[in-house]
Regions:
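Short, low-structural-confidence N-terminal segments
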Residues: 1, 21-29, 90-97
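N-terminal edge beta-strand
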Residues: 1-19, 122
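Beta-strand cores of secreted/periplasmic/IMS beta-sandwich domains, seen most often
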Residues: 13-32, 59-75
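Short loop/turn segments at connectors of secondary-structure elements within structured domains
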Residues: 31-35, 80
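Beta-strand signatures of extracellular beta-sandwich domains
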Residues: 36-40
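Surface-exposed loop/edge segments in extracytoplasmic proteins
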Residues: 43-51
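Mature extracytoplasmic or organellar-lumen-exposed domains after removal of signal/transit peptides
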Residues: 93-360
Length: 360
């Protein structure tokens, strides 16, 4: 990704790859108008990276691709869609011992995601009950509780597009409709929807308006749609690996920066949810990964423990969500420490997909 002559461009370094595991490395040199890239097939997102600010280190994701035509979608680029041709057929899924262990892990993780989105569904209904009653303080408490379930699972479910909508149409993007942040440009055709629009009203406005009630009703409906979708999903080991890595990357890009919860400042609650979700995805892969690279498993175990120990230092039973409010002062003093403990874990998790995708 680079800006050339005032236009933000997004280019592939090859337009054809053989079927099988493919690792995509994404670098944004100086294109401020582009902050995400998605790999699509038949309007379905099969891989993605977000928060690609100019100048950050390159990031990667690994997916197993079968033969056919795919599209690389870079929202905001001068040419948003590019075609990637995958030749041949992907090798048959390995059936050896390690593959079987990893396969069981994906089933366990699918059960976990169904559980989390089910609890999210209950959580937004509780939030809606408080909003409809006009109780601001009860709504704030319900908001914090519901956020945790979204943050544990967001990397797995955020790419869903409702039937009848094209990728890139925010009217059908469940991620936009549920979790659009204050820092994200508002789609004028759709408006600001979801959790953070409600957060704005509760904390910045300090009042529940008819508009807040409408937003809450919509949120319940959209989470209900998501709840229906996740029960049908199946995952590959690399999906779990990429998801765990993405959740930790989310912490670096939106939690430590204070971008996620711009009004409530419960970013450390979201931080904890991302860690828990990443840990669950990793734990589902761990028995198989231990047979592939036991040293990496020990390293990741230690890094998770370091993160959890650091996070424990911010617990506050009197605060909303059980963690200290992430004030500007706390961010200024502690962001470097939080970044230092998160980065090594992200680097380690980012190598897992390549290891599990070909395991036999």
């Amino acid at each position: 990704m680079a800006n050339d002559g005032g236009k933000d461009g997004c280019a592939l370094d090859t337009t054809s790859v053989p079927a099988g595991p493919v690792t995509f490395t994404v670098a944004n040199t100086n294109a401020p108008g582009i902050n995400e890239v998605e790999l699509l097939r038949d309007q379905r997102i099969v891989g993605e990276k977000e928060n690609l600010a100019p100048g950050l280190d390159p990031v990667s994701f690994t997916v197993s691709l079968d033969g056919g035509a795919y599209q690389l979608y870079c929202p905001g680029a001068s040419t948003e869609y590019q075609t990637l041709t995958v030749t041949g057929n992907a090798p048959a899924t390995p059936t050896g011992t390690v593959a079987s262990i990893l396969g069981q892990g994906t089933k366990d993780y699918a059960t976990y995601i169904v559980n989390q989105i089910g609890q999210l569904n209950d959580g937004v209904k509780a939030l809606d009950a408080a909003v409809q009653s006009g109780n601001v303080e009860a709504a704030k408490a319900a908001y914090a509780k519901a956020r945790l379930f979204w943050e544990r699972s967001e990397s797995t479910v955020e790419g869903f597009v409702l039937p009848g909508f094209a990728v890139g149409d925010n009217a059908g993007s469940l991620d936009y409709l549920i979790d659009m942040r204050e820092s994200t440009p508002v789609d004028a055709k759709v408006g600001w929807k979801g959790f953070h629009a409600i957060e704005r009203d509760l904390w910045q406005g300090g009042a529940i308006t008819p508009g807040t009630k409408a937003l809450s009703t919509e949120l319940v409906g959209n989470v209900g749609k998501l709840n229906g979708i996740v029960a049908t999903l199946q995952y590959k080991p690399e999906d779990l690996a990429n998801g765990a890595s993405d959740l930790i990357e989310e912490i670096q890009n939106t939690k430590i920066t204070g971008e996620e919860e711009a009004f409530s400042h419960i970013d450390l609650v979201d931080f904890s949810g991302n860690v828990e979700g990443a840990q669950q995805a990793y734990a589902s892969l761990r028995p198989g990964l231990e047979k592939i690279d036991a040293n990496l498993v020990r390293q990741i175990d230690q890094q998770f423990q370091s993160v959890l120990t650091t996070l424990d230092g911010y617990r506050d039973s009197t605060a909303l969500g059980g963690y200290k409010t992430y004030t500007a002062a706390l961010k200024a003093s502690d962001a470097p420490k939080l970044t230092a403990v998160i980065q090594p874990l992200h680097q380690s998790l980012s190598t897992v997909a390549q290891k599990v995708v070909t395991a036999g």
